[in-house]
């Protein structure tokens, strides 16, 4: 929830009797849940998010705003810092340094990828299409986690945009089945993680009914077979996408989404962002 502020009440999601909890993102909070187990019955008593050296905007009486800590500063443990320093250095060497270049910003901000098509999503999908030799590709907008600034691009930049290490997958799907699949996924609304990003695909609804689908500019032929790239999270039903994992023609590759994007930058830089602008 973009409107959540430290100290506000929050309730985790529950699905099929199982509590599902996530302490927001990027280590900003630690989630604390208190349960009672009595006579085999588990009850959630309390749940809250504890800010970790998180700065928030504070409005002053004179109308100005300043950035202040949401709670008392938590001093890092020096012994633990010293222990982790070696691993931090090793990790930094692996993810820093130029792997490619882009001539303009690639948009991946949350308030964009969940509402509209963006150039970064299209670059990500193109990378996965290249990896699988697909005709077109899709992914949920919630899977894009950060933008990539114009200029030199590092593996760190890519991992910030694609941090989940999902596997690149694809399905060879009959046109008739593809139409039925698209009838579902093209309806996911903006302002949700499920909102579909797509590339080399266009479609049209009329009276809330899917009436037109183009793949690479050509009308979908229900008698043909198409190859669609998708990550294994969405293919497994993530974000409410119809599950494809047991369908005929479905394949999960060994390549992660971040590695596919890294390889795309390495092989195709300098990248012209305008070529991936939504139309």
Predicted regions and their residues:
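Active-site-adjacent helix-turn-beta-strand microarchitecture at beta-sheet edges
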Residues: 1-94, 189-197, 202-206
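Feature captures C-terminal
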Residues: 8-19, 29, 41-45, 118, ...
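Hard-cation-handling environments
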Residues: 45-153
């Amino acid at each position: 929830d973009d409107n959540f502020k430290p100290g506000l009440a929050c309730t985790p999601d529950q699905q099929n009797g199982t509590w599902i909890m996530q302490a927001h993102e990027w280590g900003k909070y630690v989630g604390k849940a208190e349960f009672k187990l009595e006579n085999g019955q588990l009850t959630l008593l309390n749940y809250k998010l504890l800010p970790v050296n998180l700065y928030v905007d504070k409005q002053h009486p004179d109308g100005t705003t300043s950035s202040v800590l949401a709670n008392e500063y938590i001093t890092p443990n020096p012994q633990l810092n010293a222990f982790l320093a070696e691993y931090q250095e090793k990790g930094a060497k692996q993810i820093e340094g130029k792997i490619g270049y882009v001539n303009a910003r690639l948009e991946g901000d949350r308030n964009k990828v969940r509402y509209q098509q963006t150039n970064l999503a299209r670059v990500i999908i193109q990378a996965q299409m290249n990896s699988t030799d697909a005709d077109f590709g899709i992914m949920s907008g919630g899977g894009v986690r950060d933008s990539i600034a114009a200029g030199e691009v590092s593996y760190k930049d890519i991992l910030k945009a694609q941090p989940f290490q999902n596997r690149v997958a694809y399905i060879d799907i009959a046109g008739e089945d593809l139409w039925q699949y698209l009838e579902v996924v093209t309806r996911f609304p903006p302002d949700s993680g499920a909102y579909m990003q797509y590339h080399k695909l266009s479609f049209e609804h009329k009276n809330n009914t899917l009436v037109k689908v183009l793949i690479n500019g050509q009308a979908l032929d229900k008698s043909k077979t198409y190859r669609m790239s998708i990550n294994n999270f969405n293919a497994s039903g993530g974000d409410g996408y119809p599950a494809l994992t047991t369908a005929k023609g479905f394949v999960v590759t060994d390549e992660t989404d971040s590695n596919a994007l890294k390889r795309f930058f390495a092989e195709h830089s300098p990248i012209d962002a305008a070529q991936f602008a939504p139309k």
